[in-house]
Amino acid sequence: QGLIAFPRV
């Protein structure tokens, strides 16, 4: 499980 919940778009 990574820390990135919302990838930068």
From Swiss-Prot:
GO terms for cellular component: extracellular region. Keywords: Amidation, Neuropeptide, Pyrrolidone carboxylic acid, Secreted. Pfam families: Periviscerokin. Belongs to the periviscerokinin family. The lineage of its organism: Eukaryota, Metazoa, Ecdysozoa, Arthropoda, Hexapoda. It comes from Chroicoptera sp. (strain Kasungu). The modification Valine amide is found at V9. It is found in: Secreted. This is Periviscerokinin-1. It comes from the Eukaryota. The modification Pyrrolidone carboxylic acid is found at Q1. GO terms for biological process: neuropeptide signaling pathway. Mediates visceral muscle contractile activity (myotropic activity). Its main location: secreted.
